[in-house]
Amino acid sequence: MAEKFNLQDRFLNILRTNKIPVKVYLVNGFQTKGIIRSFDNFTMLLENGSQQNLIYKHAVSTIMPESFVKLTKQQNEESENEEK
């Protein structure tokens, strides 16, 4: 059976693990920058220097990473999952 693919969690996890700086635009027009340190179903923790912001996901309009994020699985990841 095909594995479920959660785009949002995969995207945020790649940003978090690779420490890719992001710009987060909120629905009220506010913009903040930083690195995603953690996230759950409802919030994400954004860190910028010594400042931390806990942002509710329902308030987020757009997340723009500073570098390209490849969301598809690598060839070796797929073969490892098939072996299990």
From Swiss-Prot:
Q: Which UniProt keywords apply?
A: RNA-binding, Stress response
One matching Pfam family, short form?
Answer: Hfq
* One example GO MF annotation: RNA binding
Question: GO cellular component terms?
Answer: cytosol
Gene3D superfamilies per record: 2.30.30.100
Q: How does it assemble?
A: Homohexamer.
What family is this? Belongs to the Hfq family.
Function as written in the Swiss-Prot or TrEMBL entry: RNA chaperone that binds small regulatory RNA (sRNAs) and mRNAs to facilitate mRNA translational regulation in response to envelope stress, environmental stress and changes in metabolite concentrations. Also binds with high specificity to tRNAs.
The protein in question is named RNA-binding protein Hfq
From what organism does this protein derive? Thermosipho africanus (strain TCF52B)
